[in-house]
């Protein structure tokens, strides 16, 4: 009997020992398969993105010729529809929601830094999880006070729409349209919640530099750097809640928000997805959505027959 028990122990130990190498090989094979699939996905995305990236690069190269730049930007301004002049309570003219994008003559657009930034933005847009009509990603954000981790949907309250405004201080269109965004906050905050999410710098002083940027801020190396930059923005947007994207840029990646972008979330669903900045960043589109929502909410109810 003792001999049989010893033999059984040897047989059991031998089986476990033989399964060890097989289990390790299976784990290695599974890991190799995942890496291969990830590589195939990256390769496929590069093939899909490259034509668009090449077109953008050619456009930036052409815009470095001042005669072409002035002609194209001037034609774009002339092609924009004239908006009705709006007056404030003091009778002064209110600036337009989307002032034209200005590019100074001394700014080069086609550089290695600019191409890297364009590729980064297009890749984030391609892989984003957020799509109009779909579920809103509940990505992580950080409070500037205390560095407490929260999630975007923590700021959604019941059935109230939540407006997300992604951007940074070194992005000229984002800063130029901040006053228009603030007017919307003041007008609709009774029924709508607003949240600014400070993301990585669009034009850092150690990256794609532009003299049109109102501030000179380097790339964020830590959350402390991002907080310091966000404080500058917070001074100009005191009525709106502000949070930071994580240093892994989880929210910017989930929403494809680089360089800047606008979203509206309601009941966990993306109701409005603005275009990717700079060209697609249109506060006037957000205003139109809010006006329609306000009309549905407070407009006359149809009479029952």
From Swiss-Prot:
The keyword Transmembrane applies. It is a single-pass type II membrane protein. It is found in: Cell membrane; Endosome membrane. Residues 64-305 are extracellular. Signal peptide: none annotated. Residues 1-43 are cytoplasmic. One of its GO terms (biological process) is hormone biosynthetic process. The chain crosses the membrane at residues 44-63. Expressed in brain only. Its EC number is 1.21.99.3. One of its GO terms (molecular function) is thyroxine 5-deiodinase activity. One of its GO terms (cellular component) is endosome membrane. Keywords: Cell membrane, Endosome, Membrane, Oxidoreductase, Selenocysteine, Signal-anchor, Thyroid hormones biosynthesis, Transmembrane, Transmembrane helix. Residues 79-98 are annotated as: Disordered. Its main location: membrane. Residues 82-96 have a biased composition (Acidic residues). It catalyses: 3,3',5'-triiodo-L-thyronine + iodide + A + H(+) = L-thyroxine + AH2; 3,3'-diiodo-L-thyronine + iodide + A + H(+) = 3,3',5-triiodo-L-thyronine + AH2; 3-iodo-L-thyronine + iodide + A + H(+) = 3,5-diiodo-L-thyronine + AH2; L-thyronine + iodide + A + H(+) = 3-iodo-L-thyronine + AH2. It is an enzyme of class 1 (oxidoreductase). Pfam families: T4_deiodinase. The active site is at 171. InterPro entries: Iodothyronine_deiodinase, Iodothyronine_deiodinase_AS, Iodothyronine_deiodinase_I/III, Thioredoxin-like_sf. Belongs to the iodothyronine deiodinase family. Plays a crucial role in the metabolism of thyroid hormones (TH) and has specific roles in TH activation and inactivation by deiodination, particularly in different tissues. Catalyzes the deiodination of L-thyroxine (T4) to 3,3',5'-triiodothyronine (rT3), 3,5-diiodothyronine (3,5-T2) to 3-monoiodothyronine (3-T1), rT3 to 3',5'-diiodothyronine (3',5'-T2) and 3,3'-diiodothyronine (3,3'-T2) to 3'-monoiodothyronine (3'-T1) via inner-ring deiodination (IRD). Catalyzes the deiodination of 3,5,3'-triiodothyronine (T3) to 3,3'-diiodothyronine (3,3'-T2) via IRD. Monomer. Homodimer. May undergo minor heretodimerization with DIO1 and DIO2. This is Thyroxine 5-deiodinase. It comes from Sus scrofa. The gene is DIO3.
């Amino acid at each position: 009997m003792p001999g049989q028990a010893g033999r059984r122990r040897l047989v059991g130990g031998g089986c476990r020992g033989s399964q060890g190498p097989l289990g390790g090989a299976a784990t290695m094979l599974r890991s190799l398969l995942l890496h291969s699939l990830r590589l195939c996905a990256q390769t496929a995305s590069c093939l899909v993105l490259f034509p668009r990236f090449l077109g953008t690069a050619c456009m930036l190269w052409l815009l470095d010729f001042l005669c072409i730049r002035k002609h194209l930007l001037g034609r774009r301004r002339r092609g924009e529809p004239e908006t009705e002049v709006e007056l404030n309570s003091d009778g002064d003219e209110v600036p337009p929601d989307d002032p034209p994008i200005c590019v100074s003559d001394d700014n080069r657009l086609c550089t290695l830094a600019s191409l890297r930034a364009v590729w980064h933005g297009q890749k984030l847009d391609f892989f984003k999880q957020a799509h109009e009509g779909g579920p809103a990603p509940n990505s992580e954000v950080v409070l500037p006070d205390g560095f407490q981790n929260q999630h975007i949907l923590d700021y959604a309250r019941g059935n109230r729409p939540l407006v997300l405004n992604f951007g940074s201080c070194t992005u000229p269109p984002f800063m130029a349209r901040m006053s228009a965004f603030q007017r919307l906050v003041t007008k609709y905050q009774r029924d709508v919640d607003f949240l600014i999410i400070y993301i990585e710098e669009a034009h850092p002083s150690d990256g794609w530099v532009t003299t049109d940027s109102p501030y000179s801020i380097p790339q964020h190396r830590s959350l402390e750097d991002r907080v310091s930059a966000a404080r500058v923005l917070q001074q100009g947007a005191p009525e709106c809640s502000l949070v930071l994207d994580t240093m892994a840029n989880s929210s910017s990646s989930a929403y494809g928000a680089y360089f800047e972008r606008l979203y509206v979330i309601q009941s966990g669903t993306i109701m409005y997805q603005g275009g990717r900045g700079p060209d697609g960043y249109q506060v006037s589109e957000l205003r139109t959505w809010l006006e329609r929502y306000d009309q549905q909410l407070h407009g006359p109810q149809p009479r029952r027959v």
